[in-house]
A protein has these predicted regions:
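Flexible, glycine/threonine- and acidic-rich loop/arm segments that mediate assembly and lattice contacts
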Residues: 1-318
């Protein structure tokens, strides 16, 4: 039997699997899934930073007039930009000569390759998802915990300094309630430039508490969603409730007492075209019998309106 070129087989296998890998990542994690299905993932071909225009003021020159009335042409402030740095993630898929020796035959080697690729896929997707929720590493994505608060600097703009650049927060240490959820939800939808909250994400503990508060009829058929997005998420196998027309889901990466309110129109994931879970050609160290493939992701989580985002923290589920 001809000798198996492990590096070549690994490269070919990973390249063929890459589209499925991307699909799996978006299927597994509900925030990514929601953004992907609703125009919340935006492709970029590069640039030093991701620059996002903001509108934080109103135009005061709006007026009624008649005939030869003088029109107000006062120059308007209120336009700014937020800048987000690109963040990069890498996972290595390594195969050694010993792997090949211990797994004789192409089928056995291929089985090992697929297992290692799946392992890399899961590790990379978990890391990106966790950072998307609560990331605080300067090299990683800005997490929702930071992006939806009221004081952090996001996109180069301080929430402490500018009141219009703040999320809506409820940090009272009380048992979660629909009335408190309603207050945060409504605050996220107030003002110009925003739109309806499109997804509420919480922990399993809080989700189960909300489920217990619902009627027995709804508990009997919890996937009987009223909204299009609710039905889509249920059909995608996500556990889902609806609160005033908004899907409520849970994610394992959420802190036990947290809840986030997301608006797909104002919260996005920018992705670099050349680093969209790209497979990088193999490298072989000169001092080791190792063949290495890399899977690379580059992007930035961003918002153009923090006031459209909300968070509840310190909520009790019992």
């Amino acid at each position: 039997m001809a000798d198996i070129n492990l590096g070549q087989l690994a490269a070919t296998t990973l390249q063929k699997y890459q589209p499925k890998l991307v699909d799996n990542i978006y299927k597994k994690h509900v925030i990514l899934n929601h953004l992907k299905a609703n125009g919340g993932t935006v492709m970029y071909n590069g640039g030093r930073q991701l620059v996002v225009p903001l509108m934080y003021g109103t135009n005061s020159t709006v007026q009624t007039f008649d005939g030869t009335d003088t029109l107000d042409t006062t120059y308007q402030e209120g336009i700014d930009v937020a800048t987000y740095d690109w963040k990069f993630y890498n996972v290595a898929v390594a195969f050694t000569m010993v792997d090949k020796i211990k797994n004789k035959g192409k089928e056995q080697v291929l089985s090992l390759l697929k297992a290692k690729i799946k392992q890399a896929e899961l590790a990379l997707s978990e890391k990106i998802n966790t950072d998307l929720i609560s990331g605080s590493d300067a090299k990683g994505l800005v997490g929702l915990l930071t992006m939806s608060d009221a004081t952090s600097t996001v996109g180069g703009i301080s929430g402490t300094t500018y009141s219009w650049w703040r999320g809506n927060i409820d940090s009272k240490a009380v048992t979660v309630s629909f009335s408190d959820m309603r207050a945060v939800k409504n605050s996220c939808m107030n003002g110009n430039g925003g739109s309806k909250v499109s997804l509420i994400v919480t922990s399993q503990a809080i989700y189960q508490k909300l489920f217990a508060l619902l009627t027995a009829t709804y508990q009997f058929n919890p996937t009987q969603a009223a909204t299009k997005e609710g039905k889509r998420l249920a059909e995608a196998s996500f556990e889902m409730l609806e609160f005033e027309g908004i899907p409520v889901v849970y994610d394992e990466a959420m802190a036990a007492d947290d809840m986030f309110f997301i608006n797909k129109d104002n919260y996005k994931l920018g992705i670099l075209e050349d680093a969209n879970f790209a497979v990088i050609d193999k490298s072989q160290p000169s001092d080791q019998h190792v063949s290495i493939q890399h899977i690379v992701f580059g992007g930035a989580a961003y918002t153009d309106r923090r006031a459209s985002l909300g968070q509840m923290t310190e909520k009790k589920s019992a």
